[in-house]
Amino acid sequence: MWADDYKVDGFRFDLMGHQPKDVMVEALAEVRKIDENTLFYGEGWDFGEVADNARFDQANQINMAGTEIGTFSDRLRDAVRGGSPFDGGVDSEGNHPLRFNQGFGNAAIANEETKVDQDSINGRLHNQDLVRLGMAGNLAEYVLIDYKGDTKLGKNVDYNGAPAGYTKMPSENISYVSKHDNQTLWDNNAYKIATGTSSAERARMQSVSLSTVMLGQGIPFIHMGSELLRSKSMQRDSYDSGDWYNRVMFDGTDNNWNVGLPREDKDGANWDLIKTIIADSTAKPDADDIELTKQQFLELLKIRSSSELFRLDTADEVMKRVDFRNVGEDQVEGLIVMSIDDGVSAGDDLDPANDAIVAVVNSTNESQSFKITGATGFTLHDVQQNSADDTVKGASFAAETFTVPALTTAVFVQAQGDAQGVGLPVDNSDKDVSSIPPYGQTTVYVRGDMNGWNPVEGWAMSFVSNGVYSVTGSLEAGNYGFKFADADWKTPNFGCDSVELANGSINLGSDGNCQLSVAEAGSYTFTLNAINELDDNVEKAVVSVTKN
């Protein structure tokens, strides 16, 4: 009815993860018979009584990959905002997780609780990896270099024990940094930003945070009023708090900051911290801050709309065109440098005006310069050359180097001439794809009769390279059934029904499991080549067992 009679062409599903996947897929197919461009998206959270597919295959983030149904991505959200929506209260050391868990968008200046130990620094650098991955559509197969210098697929980057990258197409990535649940972006930042930081700097942090969504691949989701520095007076959950906390001042005269303490049932544990924060007069923006943020947002919208390169349709296009510089062990914290190629090596000419785009997101409180060897002919985007923000007008390019002021996102374009030019191709020279474990951080075991079918440490396979895992163990003469599996019998979990046997291997039978007959006791090496998990052109895993 809604699609046919009322011409509704987009549907958002609350707690979609509590629905069966097949119901959602079937519903989309039916609605697209009326309008083939209908959009489905929803909350693919995995929790509660249906968690881990306990009752059916859920419509959660991981399962919805490949369905063309979008899911909200908490990966970039948490990385930009800092911490998680569940932070609150005081920890065992008397510190506030809501305060010390700074994110990419608000960590320019350390606050009094900011942690500077190596684990905390690594955590912030890991956040930058999550931001990059989110801006690349959160693709499971996207190749990036992490903060340790390791080449990884998106699905092998960690997010609280789950794969950070999980989509198969960018449109499945609903990218956001604020919505009706939990604190607004302004209020969340107020928890993190150092005391005494000017309201103008706070407003710039808001714009920088929003730019990670507006310039990334996927579908941007913008919370009403984000461009107006909207506050709900630190209210975490405002669905039942009335207009006093939920109002949006569309005239830009005020942002509803500090109109009262939030409700005790949701935020009582944070009242002492909130009272300290609202006592800081710099935490309240003025009308000029609000107006500039609004204009910066409208400019980001114009920039996104100006080029198809910000709206790539397929994973293949993203992986051929989108690259990140300032990566690895020596990267500058707080700096994202993203290039999008439209040169001849990228394929079709998607942007007839430009051969390449470089977006520099500087969330630090200092001007940053970054050199990309081979970059030529870039100029600041004409929207920003005529910006309402005088600061971004100071961004420049010269001698292969992009320079961007503090707390600023600048977009540079390489204008196309009479025909498609060289552009700025993805740099694969420093990416070692042979070092990518097909199963990421998951430990693969040989589990079978030789170890009671348990995930025994001595039978944990080591990743070698190029998709190959190996383990050597002692076996007595006899017959053994076994599988290649993880500790939870999830992924991987297979025997020899659907694999190929490598040359030189002892013959392996199959009855669902692999069947090995050992004629002589001794040392045996088991290998698994799972390159098929990384290369769609390889159909099956290849396995072998050899006597040493």
Each model region followed by its residue ranges:
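Loop/helix patches that line or flank the sugar-binding groove of alpha-linked glycan CAZymes
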Residues: 154-358, 363-371
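Aromatic-rich carbohydrate-binding modules that target alpha-glucans
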Residues: 433-479, 487-513
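Active-site-proximal helices and loops of the catalytic beta/alpha 8
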Residues: 15-166, 226-273, 348, 373-376
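Active-site groove signature of glycoside hydrolases
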Residues: 1-19
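Acidic glycine-/aspartate-rich tracts in secreted/extracellular proteins
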Residues: 308, 364-366, 376, 416-418, ...
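C-terminal beta-strand-rich structural cap/linker in extracellular carbohydrate-active enzymes
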Residues: 395-430, 524-534
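A glycine-anchored, Pro-Gly-centered beta-turn/N-cap motif
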Residues: 357, 366, 376, 476-478, ...
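C-terminal accessory region downstream of the catalytic core in glycan-modifying enzymes
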Residues: 201-202, 300-308, 365-397, 406
